[in-house]
């Protein structure tokens, strides 16, 4: 840069700033596109970390069940006798939360509740 006059030095600095600006704009728009990509795949586990008999022991027995339903992470059960429910055993099995009313309970287990519901329905109605 020793042989360049002031006009050439200014032009080099100006072109450097323009090039840097183009790179910044390119990377910010690319990052914005990547951040707007949505995950369209729902991850549901089919691995149940306890046996079905252990679960039946926690709710009294298999015969205590009236109805079972589930969302992704919550198991909703209707029982004949709510007094047979053992909250402490359910927590040992991995329940993160338990909500009760007169005959229905909602148990938050995790992403395997849909699989657990299907197993219980197969066991009850087969």
Curated annotation (Swiss-Prot):
Q: Which UniProt keywords apply?
A: Membrane, Phosphoprotein, Phosphotransferase system, Transferase, Transmembrane, Transmembrane helix
One GO cellular component term of this record is: membrane
Q: Which family does it belong to?
A: To M.genitalium MG129 and M.pneumoniae MPN268.
**In which compartments does the protein localize?**
Membrane
Record's function text:
The phosphoenolpyruvate-dependent sugar phosphotransferase system (PTS), a major carbohydrate active -transport system, catalyzes the phosphorylation of incoming sugar substrates concomitant with their translocation across the cell membrane.
Organism field: Ureaplasma parvum serovar 3 (strain ATCC 700970)
**Where in this chain does the record put each PTS EIIB type-1 domain?**
49-126
Q: Which taxonomic lineage is given here?
A: Bacteria, Bacillati, Mycoplasmatota, Mycoplasmoidales, Mycoplasmoidaceae
Indicate what this protein is called per its UniProt record.
Answer: Putative phosphotransferase enzyme IIB component UU178
Membrane-spanning parts: 11-31
Q: Name one GO molecular function term.
A: protein-N(PI)-phosphohistidine-sugar phosphotransferase activity
Give me any GO biological process, just one: phosphoenolpyruvate-dependent sugar phosphotransferase system
The record comments on the domains as follows:
The EIIB domain is phosphorylated by phospho-EIIA on a cysteinyl or histidyl residue, depending on the transported sugar. Then, it transfers the phosphoryl group to the sugar substrate concomitantly with the sugar uptake processed by the EIIC domain.
């Amino acid at each position: 840069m020793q042989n360049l006059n002031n006009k050439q030095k200014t032009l080099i600095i100006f072109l450097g700033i323009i090039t840097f600006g183009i790179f910044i704009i390119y990377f910010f728009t690319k990052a914005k596109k990547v951040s707007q990509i949505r995950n369209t795949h729902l991850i549901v586990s089919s691995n149940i970390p306890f046996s079905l008999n252990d679960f039946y022991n926690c709710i009294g027995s298999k015969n205590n069940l009236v109805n079972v339903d589930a969302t992704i992470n919550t198991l909703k059960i209707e029982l004949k006798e709510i007094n047979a429910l053992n909250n402490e055993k359910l927590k040992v099995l991995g329940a993160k939360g338990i909500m009760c009313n007169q005959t229905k309970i909602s148990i938050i287990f995790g992403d395997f509740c849909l699989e657990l519901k299907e197993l219980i329905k197969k066991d009850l109605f087969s």
